[in-house]
Amino acid sequence: MHDIRAIRENPEAFDRDLERRGLAPLSAELIALDDARKGAVSAAQAAQERRNALSKEIGAAKKAKDEARATELMAEVARLKEEAPGLEAAQGEAAKALDERLAAIPNRPKDDVPPGADEHGNVEYRRFDSSRERLAQGRQHFELGEATGLMDFEAAAKLSGSRFVVLKGQLARLERALGQFMLDLHTGEHGYTEVVPPVLVREEAMFGTAQLPKFRDDQFAAGENFWLIPTAEVPLTNLVRESILAEDELPLRFTALTPCFRAEAGAAGRDTRGMLRQHQFNKVELVSITAPEKSAEEHERMLACAEAVLQKLDLTYRVMTLCTGDMGFASQKTYDIEVWVPGQQTYREISSCSVCGEFQARRMNARYRAKEGRGVGFVHTLNGSGVAVGRALIAVMENYQNPDGSVTIPSALQPYMGGLTRIEGPKN
């Protein structure tokens, strides 16, 4: 959510940032809506002030025994009372029109975000190469999984339709191991507090993190006012909703392993086989709440925490700084981590780490009280995948596959697998 006062103070800068996002200028429209809101407020206030003044005049007229004047004034008061509901309604409608327009506008990109229209404008930030020899070519994860009978898309389709999977046996255990490994890393080494949040949230929570109203069609609704979370970012960030934190409490760092649900699982016809794009998947999420001057530093820290997962798994990856045309609606700046998948001979996104500034905090009314009497301001919010568990499973399967169809278990995961060192391939 944007600050209309900041827009009024520097409309040219606001429009320049929208232009970087590929949008037309909107400051004039927003200022006109705000003028209408102010006009409605002024009209309601003027009517109330007039009623207050008339009440005093009526008292004076009665004291002077001027009944005619008192009757005339009371008639005007009655008229103003009749008009009051309409003035209040106009005030509410004007405020709603402004708020709805502001809520539909994406966040302003930071100055150092590279320009670009789509993913082709993204810029490599850094990379990490595995100590293991890169496979020149390999089987895709679904070929490996289906051959063992431990990855069953046909059974999932009978249960739920397309873009679901049933994992069995050691593959199910491997996915569970990945999630537990990530949680232990983030809580034990990175200072995050583990949270087990609801996966059903109210509409206000989805609005707070900006999934609603713009991305309503991409979500799963459940009942009159419940939504299945598309990411644990929603409940974790909303933990500070409608609160005022002490600056000494910051930063807050939360992590959670949850199922995530997305009605729109990706572009039509893309990644139709396998686990890359699903309606339901597990993900470890990282969320930080900081003071404004600390958010840029926290963004780099969060990125490093997500990278540590892949480094300990010894997986090749690269970090991309997303351009203005590819970053998310609520983001000021985003880093994507893309892991190498030999089956496709390409990099695929496995984590996205974003700093949102006060954009979400304004929608949630999440504030903090600064030290030394510097007043109350909005916190900054950050979120990142730490990482997507299903995609980590894909990366492990494809990068650790063997010619016989077996999969070697990375050493970091073996303690979570009861000492198992490999998942056997299909028996001939």
From Swiss-Prot:
Q: Which residues bind L-serine?
A: 231-233, 285, 385
Positions with a binding annotation for ATP: 262-264, 349-352
User: Per the UniProt entry, what are the Gene Ontology biological process annotations, in alphabetical order?
Assistant: selenocysteine biosynthetic process; seryl-tRNA aminoacylation
Keywords attached to this Swiss-Prot or TrEMBL record, sorted alphabetically, are: Aminoacyl-tRNA synthetase, ATP-binding, Cytoplasm, Ligase, Nucleotide-binding, Protein biosynthesis
Gene3D superfamilies given in the database record:
Bira Bifunctional Protein, Domain 2, Serine-tRNA synthetase, tRNA binding domain
UniProt subcellular location: Cytoplasm
Q: Which InterPro entries match?
A: aa-tRNA-synt_IIb, aa-tRNA-synth_II, aa-tRNA-synth_II/BPL/LPL, Ser-tRNA-ligase_type_1, Ser-tRNA-synth_1_N, SerRS_1_N_sf, SerRS_core, tRNA-bd_arm
State which Enzyme Commission number(s) the record gives: 6.1.1.11
This protein's superkingdom? Bacteria
Q: Does the keyword Phosphoprotein apply?
A: no
Alphabetical GO CC annotations of the entry are: cytoplasm
Class of this enzyme: ligase
The record's catalysed reaction(s) read: tRNA(Ser) + L-serine + ATP = L-seryl-tRNA(Ser) + AMP + diphosphate + H(+); tRNA(Sec) + L-serine + ATP = L-seryl-tRNA(Sec) + AMP + diphosphate + H(+)
The annotated pathway is: Aminoacyl-tRNA biosynthesis; selenocysteinyl-tRNA(Sec) biosynthesis; L-seryl-tRNA(Sec) from L-serine and tRNA(Sec): step 1/1
Q: What is known of its domains?
A: Consists of two distinct domains, a catalytic core and a N-terminal extension that is involved in tRNA binding.
Give the family, as the similarity comment puts it: Belongs to the class-II aminoacyl-tRNA synthetase family. Type-1 seryl-tRNA synthetase subfamily.
Q: What does this protein do?
A: Catalyzes the attachment of serine to tRNA(Ser). Is also able to aminoacylate tRNA(Sec) with serine, to form the misacylated tRNA L-seryl-tRNA(Sec), which will be further converted into selenocysteinyl-tRNA(Sec).
Q: How does it assemble?
A: Homodimer. The tRNA molecule binds across the dimer.
Q: Which protein is depicted? A: Serine--tRNA ligase
Annotated organism of origin: Methylorubrum extorquens (strain PA1) (Methylobacterium extorquens)
Identify the coding gene: serS
